[in-house]
Amino acid sequence: MLQTVVAAFRAAGVDEIVVVTGALHEPITALVGDAAQAVFNPEYASGEMLSSIQRGLRHLLSEKSEAEGVLIGLGDQPQVQARSVEAVCAAFRQSGARLVVPSYQKRRGHPWLAAYPLWELLLALGPSQTPRDFLNAHADQIHYVDVDTPSILADLDTPEDYLKSRP
């Protein structure tokens, strides 16, 4: 599942991919190989996506990444398509927006992109806050990109979900 997501990001031209891991750090690191850099989130047990986003951002900052923005994607979203990732990246480059979010039938999904100036605001969020809270607080800055696939909305949380999603 994760390999498919990483492959979609690579096919879309994303150069630097960081996969934030938890309990399965070693097998996931082996799974992604050279296609992505695996970074361990010591707070993974909280189950909160925000702690993983913050861990990934801290890693990029510590590595002095030259990234202009960060795509926030889901590892359990194997149906995400490279063309959706490309559309978000293209809209970021063309619009100058600080937040770019894909939308399918007026519902926002993943991956969304936050420009570098917003990273500190994401890092400042407290443990009771969520990425959705962040997006809602900055709704006036969001540039929506309409995509033609519901794959941006679906994440597969169980093996059963994955089996149901297969053609």
Roles of regions detected by a PLM:
Residues 1-108, 121, 140-147:
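Nucleotide and nucleotide-moiety/phosphate-recognizing core
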Residues 110-114, 154-156:
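Short glycine- and hydrophobic/aromatic-rich loop-to-beta-strand nucleating segment
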Residues 115, 121-122:
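Flexible, glycine/proline-enriched loop segments at strand-loop-helix junctions
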Residues 123-167:
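Conserved alpha/beta core of the MobA/IspD/sugar-nucleotide pyrophosphorylase nucleotidyltransferase superfamily
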